[in-house]
Amino acid sequence: MSELLQLPPGFRFHPTDEELVMHYLCRKCASQSIAVPIIAEIDLYKYDPWELPGLALYGEKEWYFFSPRDRKYPNGSRPNRSAGSGYWKATGADKPIGLPKPVGIKKALVFYAGKAPKGEKTNWIMHEYRLADVDRSVRKKKNSLRLDDWVLCRIYNKKGATERRGPPPPVVYGDEIMEEKPKVTEMVMPPPPQQTSEFAYFDTSDSVPKLHTTDSSCSEQVVSPEFTSEVQSEPKWKDWSAVSNDNNNTLDFGFNYIDATVDNAFGGGGSSNQMFPLQDMFMYMQKPY
């Protein structure tokens, strides 16, 4: 609504408390004209505070209104503070405006959403300016609920945002109304654990895989700093074949599968605890990788 006002470029409306009372409220109550009608006239207590910025004639972070006040009780002097879906609650002490004799009174109020006295406090603040020493006995004799003709109110949100209660409004694109859906965080499944093979592959042309990269002969023993036990070398398949050919024997070690002993390895008469060609390989396969 500010585009309806003929204001000069760079105009800002930041009046002091004295200016609001002396130059605006006093003239309004006296039915005198105001040079620039920059303050709207509404019944402020019929609206929620977040609806008021759209009803103001001017304002960016603060909005000003002339509003009447009604009595809470027909025979009392307390104002009715119910407004929209909640109520305004006074906070702090009243501040007199004007020296040496106060001309107006400033009162601070906070808006609570819901029914009193269990409403939820919001960040909406109102500074209400009223004239001091006003005789309201005439209106009381007429049994009127009107307490004051006009008070001047400054409305603002102390967090600088026009917060509102209730669900957010739908987003409008052209002629279509699209509802905002809640954002759901995408669940990312963790990668499957890598499975290690339980089987070892032996190439007949080479020896059993080694735990270290340095090649060793059958007579070398290499101790890695990563292991506390020794790593024994593995016999080559070609060595076993040579032994077998020299003895005119195949790789038949006479292994007794019942009592797990070698009866006659390579045709010899040695006992079962003597060395035989597969001992190194069996010991290697029993060690954990």
Curated annotation (Swiss-Prot):
**Cross-referenced Pfam families, in alphabetical order?**
NAM (PF02365)
Q: Please indicate if the UniProt record lists Transcription regulation as a keyword.
A: yes
Query: In its keyword annotation, does this UniProt entry include Transcription regulation?
Result: yes
- GO terms classed as biological process: cellular response to hypoxia; negative regulation of abscisic acid-activated signaling pathway; response to wounding
Q: Which GO terms describe its molecular function?
A: DNA-binding transcription factor activity; kinase binding; transcription cis-regulatory region binding
Record remark: domains:
The NAC domain includes a DNA-binding domain and a dimerization domain.
**Which protein is depicted?**
NAC domain-containing protein 2
**What species was this sequence derived from?**
Arabidopsis thaliana (Mouse-ear cress)
Tell me the name of the encoding gene. NAC002
